[in-house]
Each structure stands twice: as structure tokens, then as C-alpha cells.
Amino acid sequence: MTSTRYEGDTWDLASSVGVTATMVAAARAMATRADNPLINDPFAEPLVKAVGVDLLSRLAGGELDPAELNDVHDGAAGSAGAMSRMADNMAVRTKFFDEFFLNATKAGIAQVVILASGLDARAYRLAWPAGTVVYEVDQPQVIDFKTTALAQLGAAPTAERRVVAVDLRDDWPAALRAAGFDPTRPTAWSAEGLLGYLPPEAQDRLLDTITELSAPGSRLATESAPNPAPGEEEKLKERMQAISQRWRAHGFDLDMAGLVYFGERNEAAPYLAGHGWRLNSVTIRDLFAANGLDPLDDDDTRMGEMLYTWGIYE
């Protein structure tokens, strides 16, 4: 399985960055099966199994206990990077973005853009108000696979779904407009699980472009990790490599450290605040507490400091 990034790289849902979307869907499937689930994504498990990555299919279907993928750094309760907390992590993240979209559309926004949509099935599972148009933007192979798989499941969108099959490194605003997007109307944007897979300068360009395409009253939700303190970056890489090694023992060969872009970058919240967005932010620890979940252990990934941000463009 190819992991190392290079300029112009592409992927499907079983390779490189694409397989992280399948991992996320596996976690949503696990969260949906929880005793007191915070989310309900009935499409997550069948989509993961349709992709066909064995380890992720077993996690999604409950045949493999994610605790078997923990390592000695994860602590008794589990740190944010522990596989045993994977379902909890994805439950609070998914609920955060679900509620963001439902609140935005309840406030009258009828135009939604999901960037790097992956195996996101919100266009099929959320109770969208009548007249809502949901644009899904992702690589052509990803869009085509999900559309076909959901059709084979007999699923029907609960909003008007428009697909924009384009790489975010290409002229995606033109493709979005060609699909009917109207930049003069307020939009609800999500950049979920995306920013860390962009080089720092590309992250800024993406946020700038969202701002340029946003009419006043538009809303945006995203999440971002803090910049590592001096000396922490190598520890983080080592931790990610250790996690990848545990996966390899179960037949899943993916180097997570090779997929993300390290280095100093503008943190999303202050950057957006400086470009006309009025923002609110919470940490993932706040979301765990608000949803009655056991607190996360500390570890050297700083995942517990992940910041979830939403705001309105003024």
C-alpha cells in the first residue's frame, strides 16, 4: 500500500490518503454499534466492507477488538491516539459536524459544501430541510466509488446531492461553480479531517478560497492540531510509526507519518479570525466531557489538544 506523498499523487479508498477516509468510516461504524451511541451512521459499515481492506472491515463489523491495536503508550483508559478510543474520538467528531450542519440549515442556510467528503454519508443520513443542496468535493475515484456503492445499497439522498469530482489541489472553485454553487448565497462549509493532509501553504490557500467564496452569514467548521513544541515533532513521528507497526502485524500496511505534512503552520482558528470569521472553539477533551465519555489519557501525540472550530463569516 503506497503511503509516501508526492506532488500530484492520487488515490482510491484503499490507498494513501484515501484509506484514511475508510479508517474514519470504520470508526463511525464502531461508534454506531456502541451501547449508547452518540451517532447513527448505518452506511459506514457496508461502505467500509465494500472497499475491502480486511483490517478495517473487521473493525467496522465488530470482528476485531480495537484494543488489540493499542500499544504501551496508550495508558489504561486510552489516550486520544489509542485505537480503543477510536470510536469515541469519531463519535464526538461526527456529532460535532452533524450538529454544525443541522444548526446552519435550521438558521436558513440551504447550500452546503463538504470538502474532501470521502465516505461521508451525511447527504443520505441527516434530516436536511427541504431545498437543501449538498455539494460533495473529492477525488474522482472516491466520488465514483461511494456513489456506486450507495446506489447498490438502495440508499437515496435526503437532500439534493451534487458531486464535484475534483482534486482540491486543482481548480475546485471552478468545478464547484459548474455544479451550480452560488457564491452570493450563504454556505455551510466543512473541512473535516483535512487540514493536516495539506502542506502549510496549501492550508492557507484553502482557507483563503473558502473565505473568498463565502457570502456574509456563511458558516465554517473544521478541526486542527496545535503546532508541535520544539522537539515534539520527532516524538510524534515515532508514535505514529509505532501505531503503523501494530497495524502491519494485522496485515494493514500504512505509514501514517508519511501521509501528513509536518512543520510550522498557521493554526486555523486565529488565521480565520484574522480573515473576517467570528469563531468559537472547543478541544476534543471538552467534547468528551460534554458527551459524558471517560477522559482521555495524556500522551505524546497532543491529540487531546485537537481544536474544533466553527464560525460565521461577517
UniProtKB/Swiss-Prot annotation:
GO molecular function, one term: methyltransferase activity
EC number of this enzyme: 2.1.1.-
Residues given in the record as S-adenosyl-L-methionine binding sites: D138, D167, L168
Major enzyme class: transferase
Keyword Metal-binding included in the entry's annotation: no
SUPFAM superfamilies: S-adenosyl-L-methionine-dependent methyltransferases
InterPro entries: Ppm1/Ppm2/Tcmp, SAM-dependent_MTases_sf, SAM_mthyl_Trfase_ML2640-like
GO biological process, one term: methylation
Keywords tagged on the record: Methyltransferase, S-adenosyl-L-methionine, Transferase
Transferase among keywords: yes
Free-text function comment from the UniProt entry: Exhibits S-adenosyl-L-methionine-dependent methyltransferase activity.
UniProt record similarity statement: Belongs to the UPF0677 family.
Protein name (record): Putative S-adenosyl-L-methionine-dependent methyltransferase MAV_4441
